[in-house]
Every structure is written in C-alpha cells, then in structure tokens.
Amino acid sequence: MIPALTVPLLFLCATSASPAAGRGVLVPPDPKSKLIPSTTKGTHAIAKPTPSQAALRHLMVPADNFGLEMLTDHQRTRATHPQRQGQDLALPDKTRAKTKVTLDNNTGPRKVNSLSNREALAGAQPEGRNFIPSFFGNSKVHQDRSQLSSYFQLHTKSSSLTASQNLQGRKYSRNNDYGSMDHESNRPGKMNPHREEEVVSNSTKPAWVINRQPSSVLFQRPAFRKGFDNKEMCIAECHRDKDEREAYCNSDFAVNGIVQDMESVGKESRLLTLLVSSDGLYKMNRLYISPDGFFFKVKILVTDTLNCHKPCLDFKPGVRYIIMGQIYHKRIIFPQAMQHLLGGRLRAGDGFIKSSSYVQRFNRKRGRKVLAAAHSKCR
C-alpha cells in the first residue's frame, strides 16, 4: 500500500520531467521507465526514450500556439515512418551519388533522382531520332563518334554523286544556252558547265597553252599593221593635254631627267639613256637604275605606235623631260625584227613608253602637279 501523501508527489515529478510540461498537456508517467544511477554521486538520469515515445512527443499538439515552432513535413514523415531512414542508408553508392537536393516552394529539401529524369526524357523523344541522344551520352563515346562521322560521310558522298549525275545528264548547246548563262557561274574559281567538253579534250595540253593569252603590249598596236596612217588620230594623240594624276596612276614608273644618249632601233623605235637625280624619282616600283656619279642612269625604249609621218614623241639630247610609262618584262613580246635589232640591249626592269604615254618638258608647274599626284590616292 502506498501512502496517500506520496501519490501527489509522484504525479508532480512525472509532469515536471515530461517535455510537454508548462505547455498545458499532462503526460502520465511510463511505468516501464526506470531511474538509472549516474556516475556522479547523488544524481540520477532518466533513461533514453524509446522510438515510440519520441514519435509521440513530436506528434503532440500544443494547447496554445504562442512561441511554438511549426513542424516541417519532412520532420513529421521521419517521425511517423522511422523505417525510411534505414531505406535511405541502404541505397547503393552509385545511386546516392546521382541524387541531388532541390528546394520546392520552401517546403523542405527533397531528393530528386537525376537518373530517373534522364530515362523519362529519353522516353519522350520520338522514335525517328533515337540516334541523337546517343551522341551526347557519357558511355560509348568512340562508337558515337564513328556513327557521327559515317553519317556525314554518307551525306557528302550522296550529295556529290547526285551533283555529278545531274551534271552528266545535262547536254548544253552553245547556240541556245550562252544567251541564258548565269553571270555568277562566270566568276573566277567556278566551273563553267558550258566548257566541260573543252576542258576534258584539252586536259593533255599544258596550262600555259590553254589559259595563257599573249601578254604583248604591242600585239595589236597599229604600228605593226600594214597600211595604217591616220592624220587625225596622230594630231589628236600627239597634241592632247594629258592629266598628270591619271597618267601617274596608270603608269609603272614616273621620273624626270635629262636625255644623255639616244639610239635609233629601226624606223619606229629609239633607245634613250636618261640621267635622273634622286629628286626626280617620283615612282619607281621595279625600275632598274644604275648609279653614275651624282645621278642615276635609266634606259627607256620609245616606240611610235601610231606610225605617223612625224614622230609623236620627239626627244632632243640635253633636254629635261617628265616621262611616265611601263616597265619591260619578259612576258612582253616584240616582233621578231625588233628583237633582232635590240640585240639584248633592253633588259627586264628597263622603261618602256609608247605614243600614248605621258611625255612633257619639265617646268616647275608640271613638277608640282606630278608631286601632288604622287601624294594623292589613286582610284
């Protein structure tokens, strides 16, 4: 028999030891709980609560809501289903590494399996394009690269075969198709389908025979045509005022110097030796000059291309001239008679002028115009 005074004391001790004390809820003491003596003398510790007691404590509803923290959904699920913790720990290492934590509307951390998302996305792809995700996967990289390269190789081969078949199937006629030819196909670097047969037939010949035209400046000049004599053209060309800037831009060299020597090469040509100072070299490019004391020697071939009664380019020894012309090179082809008369006296790099070239006596006004043309930009 327990005395009547000890029952209220035990009831008060149980209520003070419970976590819900002071919150308006009374919890009766558990008869299975025991007092375990601690290591220190005169003190006692309560035994660790069982999982059922911990779940009951978390699920208790407070009497008043003032100063109480709300429980999250995650904590409630863990309290009501404690066996799920063991399931999370039992997951394999690979699956646990592929999970990532996300937040959804501040309801707490949730685990999302990235592997399941990938499988769902792969299942949503259409069946006709099943090869596309395999190129971007982490496994079988070498096989995917070989598939991709083979796909593009087949595509290029098929396109080239179709283009060649279309080109072979067409038959062009020169009379009908040249009028409707596209100008874009006539650009350099593009194949002209109208001349396909000519290219095939001339493939055995060297390139310089097929593509090269005679680069002679004198090839179609009137001086080498028989019976050419036009007085009006001679007067117009010889007495025409020529623009310094236009002549400077259209010429390879521009100098002013004194005629030192003059040799006749046949009836229509002369070979000049010009003494030029350093100030008289307006434009040189690859003009060949040889030093001679304080001056430079320049050789210039003069040809009368108009074949007039009186030479259009009239030079006198000891007179200073402004001359603009072209530079001779080996691709310029002279008639065989003139080549025999020159006899190697004209070398590559020497000057070459004709009747339409700029030749004027030097004065200060013309000298300033040529200097202005030298400092201006050509169009």
Swiss-Prot record:
Cross-referenced PROSITE patterns: NTR
Disulfide bonding pattern of the chain: 234-308, 238-312, 249-378
Ranges where the NTR domain occurs: 234-378
Keyword presence, Plastid: no
Gene3D superfamilies on file: 2.40.50.120
Signal peptide interval: 1-17
Superkingdom of origin: Eukaryota
Region (Disordered): 76-95, 162-194
Entry keyword set: Disulfide bond, Signal
Biased composition (Basic and acidic residues): 180-194
Similarity comment text for this entry: Belongs to the UPF0450 family.
Protein name: UPF0450 protein C17orf58 homolog
Organism: Xenopus laevis (African clawed frog)
